[in-house]
Structure formats: C-alpha cells, structure tokens
C-alpha cells in the first residue's frame, strides 16, 4: 500500500509540473503521439461512442438512424454483414436439403416443410435472416421491393399471404418447399429472441404438423438449440441457427444442421478497438486495416467498413459438419489481433459498456467473454452492465454519472432508442 501511495503522489506531482509548464499550442480533445483523452478534458457529448450488435435504425423500415451514427466525430457502429450472413444461412439450408434429398422428406409427401423461429420483427438482423432463408428456398414474396419478413403464423395449406410455396429440383425430382409456420419469439414480458418461447413453439408446431416438419430454421442459435433440445434432436430433424455458439457447434455432431459464425472474435475486437483509437487520437484504421505498433492487423477478408454508414461489419462463415471442429470454442480471440498494447503508449482508460440482455446466449456466453479478453489487450478498464432485455431504462438508470468514463459502448434493447442514451450524454 505504501508503494502504491508513493507512486500515486509521484504521478500527481508530475501532472502538476506539466500543468505549470503549459503548452505552446491550443488545446484539443484528442492528441497524437500516444497521448489520449481524459475524462476531465472532454465533454460527455464529445467522448468516443460505439454502437454495437444493434445498429441504430427504424425498427419498422430498417432505415439507418444517421443522427445516432454521426453523433460526434468519434461515433461508429460495429456489427456484422447481416445480408451476407443471411444469404449464407439460406444457402446452407438449401444445400443441406439438396445433399440429403433421399431422407429429408420424412413423410414422403413431396413437400419439404420447415418452421421458422423469428427473433425480433423490428430488428434489422432478424429481418435479414428471415429474408435470406425465404430467398434461398423460394418461399419469399415481394413487399414494396423487398422480401416480406413478417411472420406467417400457421401455413399448413400454403395460402398465407406472407410467403409462397417454393420449389427445389434434385436429380430430376421436384419438391415443393413450404414454410409451415413462423412466429416472433417474444415472451409475455416483452423480451424478444426468447429461447424458452421457441422451445414452447416447437412443441405446438410438432403437435400440429408432425412428420410434415422436415427442417427447423432459427434466426439465432439460442432459439435453435432450445427447439433442438426440446424436439428436433430426438426426432432427427436438422435444425439451423445463427451465431456459432459453442453449444450449437458441439451439437452438430449430434444432428444440429449448421450455424453461421458472425466472427464474434472480430466484432468484439472492433468494438473496443475503435474506442481505443479514438482515445489515443490516432487514425481510426490503426490496428484494423493498418498494423499497429504491437503488430495487430485484420485482413480484408474478415471485415468491411462502410464510410457512409460509419459502420464496421465482420464477415460471416458457414459452420457445418464439414468444418465445425474449427469452431468449437467461440471465445478464443482472433490470432492476428491478439497482441498486447504497450501501456506506456496506450494508458488505461475507463469504458462504460452495456449488454442489452444479460440472459442473451450469444452476447453473454460468446461476445462478453471475448470483450473481456480484448479489454486487457487494449488496456481498457471496462464496466459491464447487463440489461433485462425489455426496457432501456433498466440500462440507462445505471449510467448516472457519464463524466467518470472516457468512452461508451452501447447495445440498445430496441434499435429505435439511440436517443435514450445520447440524451444522457448531452446533459
């Protein structure tokens, strides 16, 4: 304790000496050459901010919230390429059907029936994944120039307005592809992407459709695994999810059809890296597309940056029986960006970060463990806040004093609600 006290006194003395010396030039919020912002130097509204996992947007139209994405000069979004991943999931399901055409039609009626668990009808990623599956299987219908992503309810007769019957031809044989049922998995408290609701839904669907269900598709692995464990596994029905959660990847050996890795290892790195760069006052591409002083750099086949959207997107990879052993641990950091930053050049800074739902399987079991590994490598002292998945106030009420933080990483409950957070920073 004595050594620690002496060290603190020395730092204080040095700071006082530097302040007395003054400076030749004008002050600025961020400085070059390894210096960084401090909480006392910068107004909360000017501090680095990254939105992640849930892109600020209109939940009805999907239109990006450009005000939130351009909140200040150090604001960015980090997620994954939703459309690329969605199309990949759809193609993965289609290819599985084509490769297993001899056994996929369980009741031999010539109709490949599938059920679909939709995460959140107002979430861009959920919308994209629903569209991706319907596009690949030919079951999508046009609505205002886009594939309709609304739940079809029950559709045993193929007459639902939200979907149509598709067709797949394999070895000269035609199969009808029908979305037998789909619904948003929202629980009674309002939480979406709800695994328990999906588990209950597959019980209802299996009672109604029986052996007409040939494939189960889910917008994520949390819901997918709930349905797999509740029904699909015992009935040997291939189930497809999204996120490459460790339990889902392991379940591929037991009949889980496949999943999509959204490169959470790259996303988590980017989430904290853009903050680190802004705090250091260096080019935003440092340690991303350009090698940093520790040797960290990402190759352009694992991410894209869209300047007009101020958004970094990780690219997706299909995980199937052919390659699942390469993805068994979803919490391993991405090797090309695993080098420790020098604390002398990149001093510790404090970050406030929230997870919209502490019970979300992907965010809690994959994303946050990765963040916690990267925060050490990037010398960031991160305070993690877990929400209830239902209300923004459950999270915003715990951001009582933004002034004690150097930067913010925000994962909203609803994509429309960016203003709930920026209002706090504007005070």
PLM feature spans:
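Sec-dependent N-terminal signal peptides of Gram-positive bacterial secreted proteins and lipoproteins
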Residues: 4-24
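A residue-level marker of the well-folded mature domains of exported/periplasmic proteins
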Residues: 21-427
């Amino acid at each position: 304790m004595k050594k620690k006290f002496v060290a603190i006194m020395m730092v204080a003395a040095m700071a006082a000496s530097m302040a007395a010396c003054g400076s030749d030039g004008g002050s600025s919020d961020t400085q070059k050459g390894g210096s960084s912002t401090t909480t006392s130097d910068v107004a909360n509204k000017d501090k680095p901010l990254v939105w992640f996992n849930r892109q600020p947007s209109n939940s009805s139209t999907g239109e990006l919230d450009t005000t939130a994405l351009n909140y200040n000069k150090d604001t960015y979004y980090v997620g994954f390429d939703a459309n690329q991943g969605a199309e990949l999931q759809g193609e993965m399901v289609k290819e599985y059907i084509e490769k297993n055409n001899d056994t996929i039609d369980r009741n031999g009626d010539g109709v490949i029936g599938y059920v679909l668990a939709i995460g959140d009808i107002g979430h861009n990623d959920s919308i994209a994944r629903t569209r991706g599956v319907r596009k690949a299987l030919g079951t999508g219908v046009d609505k205002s120039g886009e594939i309709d992503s609304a739940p079809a309810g029950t559709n045993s007769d193929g007459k639902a307005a939200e979907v149509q019957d598709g067709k797949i031809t394999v070895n000269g044989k035609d199969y009808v592809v029908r979305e037998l049922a789909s619904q948003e998995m929202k629980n009674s408290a309002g939480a979406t992407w709800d695994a328990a609701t999906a588990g209950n839904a597959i019980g209802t669907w299996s009672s109604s459709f029986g052996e007409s269900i040939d494939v189960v598709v889910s917008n994520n692995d949390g819901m997918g695994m709930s349905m797999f464990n509740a029904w699909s596994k015992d009935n040997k029905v291939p189930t497809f999810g999204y996120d490459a959660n460790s339990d889902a990847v392991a379940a591929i050996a037991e009949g889980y059809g496949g999943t999509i890795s959204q490169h959470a290892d790259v996303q988590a790195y980017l989430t904290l890296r853009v903050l680190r760069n802004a705090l250091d006052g260096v080019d935003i591409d440092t340690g991303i597309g350009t090698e940093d002083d520790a040797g960290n750099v990402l190759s352009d086949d694992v991410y894209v940056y869209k300047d007009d959207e101020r958004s970094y997107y990780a690219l997706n990879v299909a995980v199937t029986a052919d390659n699942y052993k390469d993805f068994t641990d979803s919490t391993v950091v991405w090797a090309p960006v695993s080098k420790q930053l020098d604390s002398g050049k990149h001093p510790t800074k404090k970050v406030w970060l929230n997870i919209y739902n502490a019970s979300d399987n992907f965010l809690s079991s994959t994303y946050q463990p990765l963040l916690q590994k990267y925060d050490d490598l990037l010398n960031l002292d991160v305070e993690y806040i877990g929400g209830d998945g239902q209300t923004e106030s459950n999270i915003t009420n715990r951001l009582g004093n933004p002034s004690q933080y150097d930067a913010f990483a925000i994962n909203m409950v609803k994509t429309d609600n960016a203003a709930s957070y920026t209002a706090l920073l504007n005070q």
